[in-house]
Amino acid sequence: MSALNWKPFVYGGLASITAECGTFPIDLTKTRLQIQGQTNDANFREIRYRGMLHALMRIGREEGLKALYSGIAPAMLRQASYGTIKIGTYQSLKRLAVERPEDETLLVNVVCGILSGVISSAIANPTDVLKIRMQAQNSAVQGGMIDSFMSIYQQEGTRGLWKGVSLTAQRAAIVVGVELPVYDITKKHLILSGLMGDTVATHFLSSFTCGLVGALASNPVDVVRTRMMNQRALRDGRCAGYKGTLDCLLQTWKNEGFFALYKGFWPNWLRLGPWNIIFFLTYEQLKKLDL
């Protein structure tokens, strides 16, 4: 068995941070779209945004362009932990399963993707909670990352920082279990078929495909996860809106219809698409460094 390779961990973290910075305003509109229209939360009952472009324009006009990067600090911190662990663990698990990349199968890649997604997302969950809380707030009433962290910890305790961890792990299992294997398999078949070489164009097409498939598979879980993380706990520890993840899913479907589970799909895909393209193009170039 070969020694643990550090490069996928470092390259994965760097590429993840680069992709996050490039697509963060789209992610912010996705969060705002997903939390609006909740009949059981007066703070988010109003439908303020008609779609992604309207949200971008209204937030920029009313809160300033800086508001489009509300929550970027915990988002970068999240990618430094989540992205690093996710890619490093995925690549390491694959090499434990099979020695050569040519011998990888879809099943092996999916299992490795699911495991790496669950592990990395569970560890990085507090940064995810911070990011969503900061994105949901109007920038006029928003404090910094440390203030937000202390506010959650003081009012909700340690449990507040791991709120929605099961949903986050489920979403990560779906996203990572779909996106990374789809990228690897698409890239492998394009190269082995002779249609394309190991080029930037191949990386672009493979990453675009995995972003679309990942968005379709993960959006319902993402909506529920976002709402669960955004709701505040009462002083007695109870939650004001949803009793749990299943209750959130059923209430959302019942009160707003099935397609409410696909709220924010376009910004979700338009984020996952460019995010994956930036990530994989950066990652593939970093792999070529002679270190």
UniProtKB/Swiss-Prot annotation:
Family: Belongs to the mitochondrial carrier (TC 2.A.29) family.
The name this protein goes by in its record: Kidney mitochondrial carrier protein 1
Function of the protein: Antiporter that transports inorganic anions (sulfate, sulfite, thiosulfate and phosphate) and, to a lesser extent, a variety of dicarboxylates (e.g. malonate, malate and citramalate) and, even more so, aspartate. The sulfate/sulfate exchange is much higher than the phosphate/phosphate and malate/malate exchanges. The transport affinities is higher for sulfate and thiosulfate than for any other substrate. May catalyze the export of sulfite and thiosulfate (the hydrogen sulfide degradation products) from the mitochondria, thereby modulating the level of the hydrogen sulfide.
Membrane topology: Multi-pass membrane protein
Organism of derivation: Mus musculus
Complex formation: Interacts with VDAC1.
InterPro entries: Mit_carrier, Mito_Metabolite_Transporter, Mitochondrial_sb/sol_carrier, Mt_carrier_dom_sf
Gene Ontology biological process terms from the UniProt entry: inorganic anion transport
Keyword Transmembrane helix: yes
Transmembrane annotation, as ranges: 9-26, 71-89, 106-124, 164-183, 204-224, 264-283
Induction of expression: Up-regulated during fasting and in the regenerative phase following renal tubular injury.
A GO term for molecular function: solute:inorganic anion antiporter activity
Repeat is among the record's keywords: yes
Gene Ontology CC annotations of this record: mitochondrial inner membrane; mitochondrion
Modified residues (N-acetylserine): 2
Tissue distribution of the protein: Present in kidney (at protein level). Expressed predominantly within the kidney cortex in the proximal and distal tubules and at lower levels in the testis and white adipose tissue.
Reaction catalysis annotation: sulfite(in) + sulfate(out) = sulfite(out) + sulfate(in); thiosulfate(in) + sulfate(out) = thiosulfate(out) + sulfate(in); sulfate(out) + phosphate(in) = sulfate(in) + phosphate(out); oxalate(in) + sulfate(out) = oxalate(out) + sulfate(in)
Alphabetical keyword list: Acetylation, Membrane, Mitochondrion, Mitochondrion inner membrane, Repeat, Transmembrane, Transmembrane helix, Transport
Short name of one Pfam family: Mito_carr
Solcar-type repeats, residues: 7-96, 104-189, 198-289
Subcellular location: Mitochondrion inner membrane
